Amino acid sequence: MSKATKKVRDKWRAKEWYDVYAPAYFGEKKVASIPCSDPVKVIGRVVETTLYDITNDFSHQSQKLYFLAANVKGTRADTILKGHEYSADYLRSLVRRGSTRIDAIFNVTSKDQYVTRASVVAFTRDRVNANQEHLIRSIMRKIIEEKAGTLAYGQLCHEMVLGLFGSEIYNLAKKVSPLRHVGVRKSKLLIIPEGVMAKPGETSVQPKAVEA
């Protein structure tokens, strides 16, 4: 055995496997196992999976989920949702000739102070004019921005990922023009409140010191 091969094998022997779990608002399901030589290095790692892997619902295969490792205890890594998105193939499948695609992007703040960027998309049955597009975007904004502030981050994730926002927008916007699909096609977590994620050099959130 060459020295280089032995060195690589020794590096792998020094690594431990960490089980990565979805957050409670996605059932705390195990979504991955990752090797790492130091639990501190697990913090900040991002794991990609699909909503199908969480729900076992075949219709959810087109939704990608990204989980961010926030805390490690033993060999268990707990996460928060960093974001989600439609697969490129699914998004392409929604396009139809003679229809209009309407996009809007909103930065929203949850009740517990997470800031998320939500990218909303609507596909109409027929081509619409500029005024109709404006009205549909206004409905998107009203529902997303008003409701986001009343929800904790976990609830907000459910609304975005499971299509609940899309259903609410659809039911109002269809009065402007017939629609084929509405949904939050992508989300991205921008700001995480203090005390949620382990600080650099630590593996878990430390309890606050009690003042004398």
Regions of interest found by a model, annotated:
Residues 158-162, 167-170, 182-198:
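Short, highly charged C-terminal tails/helix-capping segments
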Residues 86-91, 129, 152, 190-193, ...:
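General structural signal for secondary-structure boundaries
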Residues 109, 141-152, 161-166, 170-178:
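Signal for well-folded cores of large energy- and translation-related assemblies
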Residues 109-153, 201:
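Short acidic, glycine/tyrosine-flanked loop/strand segments centered on an H-E-D-like triad
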Residues 1-15, 195-212:
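Intrinsically disordered, compositionally biased charged tails
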Residues 81-86, 134-138, 199-204:
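Short intrinsically disordered coil segments
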Residues 2-128:
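Hydrophobic-cavity lipid-handling domains and compact docking modules
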